[in-house]
Structures are given as C-alpha cells and as structure tokens.
A protein has these predicted regions:
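Short, solvent-exposed loop/turn segments at the edges of extracellular beta-sandwich modules
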Residues: 112-120, 221-228, 331-337
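Recognizes extended acidic, P/S/T-rich segments that occur
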Residues: 272-319
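Conserved aromatic anchor
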Residues: 203, 254-268
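Extracellular interdomain linkers/hinges and stalk-like, low-complexity segments
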Residues: 2-48, 118-165, 227-246, 251-255, ...
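Extracellular acidic, Ser/Thr/Pro-rich low-complexity tracts
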Residues: 42-49, 160-168, 207, 221-223, ...
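Conserved small/polar residues in nucleotide/adenosyl-binding loops
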Residues: 349-351
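Strand-loop-strand motifs at the edges of beta-sheets in extracellular beta-sandwich domains
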Residues: 74-99, 184-206
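Beta-strand-rich modules
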Residues: 314-335
C-alpha cells in the first residue's frame, strides 16, 4: 500500500499559498547491490516559500502513520548493515551508500513548506525502491556544481556536464523555481547523447528576483541502461540587489550632509547609513560577502524606511579635524536583504 498526503494552510494572514510542485514522479525506483543510489523529488514552491525535507514513517491504511510497527528503514535491515541511508534536509536528495541485499523497499519523504519561519503546509510522498543484484549498469554522474551569486541585471550563464561510464545514452534535465517564474524565468538548453550530456543554464535576473533566500536548482541525469539509473546534483543561486550609487558628502560646521541616488530597483524598502573614523578599504567581493559594511569595520548610524528618503545629516559625536568615511546601502525584502554599499566608500571627510 502506498499513500500520498498533502496539507496546505489557507489563511488571510498568510496571503496566497500554492501547493508544492514536483518534477520527478515517485515511480518505482531501481537500485543496484553495492552501488550508490540517489533520488530527488525535484520539488519547488511556486510562491518562493522555503522547503525542508525529512524521512518519516510511511503511511498505511487510512493514511495513518506506520510508526511503532514492523517498518524498518532500508539501512537498518540486518543484511544491509554497514550501509548508510539518509536525506539532505535542504535539497531533498536521498542517498543510500550502498545497498547490500536485493529486495523491495519503501521510504517516505516529508516535504515541509515554510514562510517567515512558520510551517504553512507539507506533502508526504512514498517511494518504492527495488534493489537488484542483476545490475551490469553503473550510474551516471554529474560534475559537481558550485553555488552561484549574481547581481541584478547581470546574466548568469554556465554549462553543467554529465557523463556515463558505460557510454549509455544520457538525458539531462533541470528543476526549480527560477524556471517557473512569471517574469524573466531561467532557461536550460540541453544536449543529450551517448556517454555524455550537458545543459546550459541562462538567467537574466531582474529587480523582482531579489529575495533573502537563495534559489535552489536541481539537476537530474538519467541513462538508458538496464536498469535505468540516475544522478542528482543541487546548487543555490543568490540574487543580489544593485549597488547603490551617487553618494555625495559635505562638511558643514561639525556636521556632515549626505545625499545619494535612489536605486533603479524601486522595490527597495529603505536605506542604511554607515560611518567609520578613518579610511575603509573595500577588498571583499560584495556578492559573496553580504553585509560588507560591517566587514569593513563600519558602524550603522541611521536607517530609513522610505524609498524617497535620500538625505541624511550626521551630527552625532563628530570630532573637529577627524576624518570620517561613509557608505549607504539599500534594503530589500522587508529589510532582510542589503545591497552592496555606495561606490564612494573611500571618501574621507575633514570636520
């Protein structure tokens, strides 16, 4: 008996809430004795909510949990002693290294949907797995994919490669929210072939893609051997807001006046002003180091919550003939995402 259970919360306080989508069918899976097995449901949330993954007890009759019954996880079967079985809670990839005994197995994945730290729904999916010893085929493999970081209005473009030791025909595919966005979705152009396959991910990011959480992308590579085997790789794409520009500063008495340009992304929610006595040397890559102003040893002295508020006067504990350095950043996504600082970070002011 197999079961599928889905729970979704509908609330005026939550706003629109869609159910989790999956691009991989939990059809009967095949694994080989003494060879690594991986599986991923290729899930994403159309609303951009975060997903987490866990292995749970299967559901039995009337969709009741089989906890405290005879059910045993595959790796806890005595004949599979020494093998490891688990799931990546962030990507959903199930791994079994390596099954020792042929037979029929079942495992169940709970995919939980989160928004602003609160659970708002989940899906429970059963997966049937057949482990066979009649397995001349070896699984294909995807070249490891590092996490990516891209600034708004830049284009992310790179190749993903996969190969097969048996020279079987390979098919490569992608899944994730970036490919299902209403505005400027990512594309994945692929070439399938014997022993080798590749895909080119291309994404021209825009202001609407700015958010705190990275975008998870899953890649699947499947051969046509006997039995058919697959490999999965997951990676994150972080989309960074544009650098704030046009900071001008002038000393008037024992105060400093600051003005700056509004960002071209009009979904900014406000600004943060930082100050440091002496110079600041920006040697860090802002895309890879969010919060770079703090990394420069600067102190937050002012925050605004209005896109049009681009003027500030600093008259707080400034010393005569002291040199000060200022930067301003724009805030996005309910002040959870901070832009790169203004390009005049090295300006020095005499009071």
């Amino acid at each position: 008996m197999f079961a599928l259970k889905s729970v979704i919360n509908i609330s005026a306080f939550l706003g629109h809430n869609s159910s989790i989508q999956f691009d991989e069918c939990p059809c009967p899976e095949i694994a080989c004795v003494n060879k690594p097995y991986v599986y991923n449901p290729m899930g994403y949330d159309p609303d951009g909510d975060s997903l987490s993954y866990a292995l749970v007890y299967p559901l039995g009759q009337s969709a009741l949990s089989l906890a405290n019954t005879v059910y045993t996880l595959p790796n806890l079967v005595p004949q599979n002693a020494g093998s490891s079985f688990g799931i990546d809670p962030l990507t959903g990839t199930v791994f079994w290294s390596n099954p020792q005994m042929q037979g029929e197995y079942n495992f169940t994945i709970k995919i939980t949907e989160w928004r602003n730290g609160f659970e708002i729904g989940y899906v429970i999916r059963d997966v049937q797995l057949t482990v066979t010893s009649q397995c001349p085929n070896n699984p294909p493999s995807i070249v490891a994919i590092p996490d990516q970081c891209v600034n708004v209005d830049d284009t992310l473009n790179f190749v993903i490669n996969g190969s097969d030791p048996n020279q079987d025909f390979l098919s490569i595919s992608s899944s994730g929210l970036p490919f299902n966005l209403a505005s400027n979705p990512a594309t994945f152009a692929f070439v399938n072939g014997n022993g080798y396959a590749n895909g080119v991910l291309n994404w021209r990011t825009t202001c609407t893609h700015i958010r705190q959480a990275p975008y998870l992308v899953n890649i699947q590579l499947t051969d046509n051997g006997n039995p058919t085997l697959s490999d999965f790789e997951s990676f994150n794409i972080k989309v960074r807001p544009p650098e704030l520009e046009g900071l001008n500063i002038s000393a008037v008495g024992n105060a400093v006046n600051l003005t700056w340009n509004k960002p071209y992304c009009n979904n900014a929610t406000g600004y943060s002003v930082y100050r440091k006595a002496g110079a600041a040397n920006p040697t860090l890559n802002c895309c890879d180091n969010p919060g770079i102003a703090n990394n420069l040893g600067m102190t937050l002295i002012h925050q605004t919550s209005n896109l049009n508020d681009t003027v500030y006067t600093d008259n707080n504990n400034l010393n005569i003939d002291e040199k000060y350095c200022y930067v301003v950043t724009a805030m996005y996504d309910y002040d959870l995402v901070e832009s790169c600082p203004t390009d005049t970070v090295l300006s020095l002011i005499h009071i």
